[in-house]
Amino acid sequence: MLNIATDEICSLIRYRIQNYNSELKLNNVGVVFKVGDGIVRVFGLQGAMAGELLLFEEGSVGIAFNLEKNNIGVVLLGDCTLIQEGMIVKGTGKIGEVPVGDKFLGRIVDSLANPIDGKGDIVSSQTRLIEPPAPGIVDRRSVYEPLQTGITAIDAMIPIGRGQRELIIGDRQTGKTAVAIDTILNQKGKDVKCVYVAVGQKSSSIAQVVTTLQDKGALDYTILVSAAADTTATMQYIAPYSGTALAEYFMYNGSHALVVYDDLSKQAQAYREMSLLLRRPPGREAYPGDVFYLHSRLLERAAKLSDSLGGGSLTALPIVETQEGDVSAYIPTNVISITDGQIFLSSDIFNAGFRPAINVGISVSRVGSAAQPKAMKRVAGKLKLELAQFAELEAFSQFASDLDQATQNQLARGKRLREILKQPQYSPLSLENQVGIIFAGTNGYLDKVSIENIPSYITSLTESLKNEKSKFGDVILSTKDFTKDEENVLRNILEAS
C-alpha cells in the first residue's frame, strides 16, 4: 500500500505559498495595423512619448512621430519590407542617441553612426543624444577667434569666427560644396575636428568628396556622415542631428569643431515627405508649419562655449540650394534668418569664369568681423572700399563714351583686385599669403602687371613670401598683426619681384 507523506507535502505547499511572487510584468505594447512608404501606423502604446524609439517584433526600430487619438504614426529608421500588419511593437522609453568619440575620425558612417566604409566596427563607450538641448545664454561667450577658410574673398570680406553659423547659399553647380571642402582642407594642423554631413547627395558625389579628403590628408581629422539619395527620408532627416552630436563631443571636451551640412534643402524636403505621409497639414510650399523649428533647433547647437565649460566651439556651415537665384523662397529665408550671415554664390559670376563665384555685394558676416585677425583687418578695409567703388564705376562706364584717366586707372585696378580673389579649387591660402596678395593689389603693385599674368605673379609672390617666412610669415602667424616692420619687409619683397 502506497504511503503518502502528508507532512512533507504540506510543508512543500506552505513553502511555495510563502515564496509565491505575485508581481506582474507589464509591457507597453502596440500592434501594427498599417505600413507603407516608410511610415507605420500602430494601435495601442498609450504611454508612448513624442520622439521615443519603438522596437518592432522583427528587430526594426522606429521613432514615434505623430501621437494621435487612436494610433501612433511611426517613421522607420530602416527598411519596411519585413514589417507586416499584426506585428507587436514595444516602447523602449528612450530617445535616439548615437555613439561618439575620437575613433570616429577618418571614418564614414550612416545617420545612426554605424560604419559603412568596410573598415570594421567602431568601439565607443560614450553616447550623445541625437537632439540634446542647445547651450543656453550663460553657457556661451561671444565669437572672437577666427576660423580661416583659406579662401581670400571670404577671409578678407566675409570673415567667419569659431562658434559662428555661416550659410553658404546659391544655385546648383555654383561651387557651394567646393567652398565647404576648401574650408575643411584649410583646418589641417589647426586642431579643428571636422564633420561633413551629406544629405540627399548622389553616392558618386560623396565618393568624390571622400577621395578629395583622402588625397589632401584631411580625412584623418574629419568624420563623414552619409545619408545618400537612396536612403529613406527618415535617415536623411536625422543625419544633420547625428552629425552635430558627433561634433558636439569635441566641443564639450574643450576642442574646436566644424560641421558642414550639405545640404539643408534636401533635409527639409525629406521632412516634408515624412510630414505629408503622416497627414500633417501642409503650409507654404507644402512644408509643414514647424519647418523653421526643424532648422533652428539644429543650428542653435553651434556655439562658442564659455571658459567654465572648457571654451570649446562648434562652427556650422549649412548649405542651401536656391532655384534661379531666388533667395526669397521659404527655406532660404528661414535659414538666412537663423544664421549669423551668408555667403551667396552667383551662377552669373560662376559662368563669367570667376571662381569661387562669391557675390560680395549681398554676402555678409554678422559676427565674424570681431574674430578677424588684425593683420587681415588692416588690409581688407581698403579692398572692400575699392571693390565697391569699382562695381559702381563699372556699371556707369557701360554708358559713358569717354572716361578721364583717373577713372580708367580705378577701373584697371578694380579688375586686378577682382582677379586676385580668383582661386583654384582645393588650394586654400595661408593668412600671410592672403595679406601679402591683398596688400600688393590695393597698393598699386599690380597696376603694371597685365591681367593674364596675375596668376603667375601671385605664384611667384607666395614663393618669395615662403623664402622670407622667418621675417614675415612667422611674425604674422604668431602676432596676427601687420605692423610697420612687416609692411616694410613686404614692400621690399614686392619691389624686388
Curated annotation (Swiss-Prot):
- Does this UniProt record's set of keywords contain Repeat? no
Q: What is this protein called?
A: ATP synthase subunit alpha, chloroplastic
Per its database record, what is this protein's job?
Produces ATP from ADP in the presence of a proton gradient across the membrane. The alpha chain is a regulatory subunit.
Recorded GO MF terms: ADP binding; ATP binding; proton-transporting ATP synthase activity, rotational mechanism
A Pfam family annotated for this chain is ATP-synt_ab_N
Q: Which domain of life is it from?
A: Eukaryota
**Which positions in this protein are listed as binding ATP?**
G170, D171, R172, Q173, T174, G175, K176, T177
Reaction catalysis annotation: ATP + H2O + 4 H(+)(in) = ADP + phosphate + 5 H(+)(out)
Quaternary form? F-type ATPases have 2 components, CF(1) - the catalytic core - and CF(0) - the membrane proton channel. CF(1) has five subunits: alpha(3), beta(3), gamma(1), delta(1), epsilon(1). CF(0) has four main subunits: a, b, b' and c.
Hey, which family's this protein in?
A: Belongs to the ATPase alpha/beta chains family.
InterPro entries named among the record's database cross-references: ATP_synth_asu-like_sf, ATP_synth_asu_C, ATP_synth_asu_C_sf, ATP_synth_F1_a_nt-bd_dom, ATP_synth_F1_asu, ATPase_a/bsu_AS, ATPase_F1/V1/A1_a/bsu_N, ATPase_F1/V1/A1_a/bsu_N_sf
Cite the EC number.
7.1.2.2
Among its keywords, does the record have Disulfide bond? no
Starting at the broadest rank, the lineage of the source organism is:
Eukaryota, Sar, Rhizaria, Cercozoa, Chlorarachniophyceae
**Residues at site: Required for activity?**
S363
What is its subcellular localisation?
A: Plastid, Chloroplast thylakoid membrane
Membrane topology per the entry is: Peripheral membrane protein
Query: Which cellular component, as a GO term, is one annotated location?
Result: proton-transporting ATP synthase complex
Alphabetically list the UniProt keywords. Answer: ATP synthesis, ATP-binding, CF(1), Chloroplast, Hydrogen ion transport, Ion transport, Membrane, Nucleotide-binding, Plastid, Thylakoid, Translocase, Transport
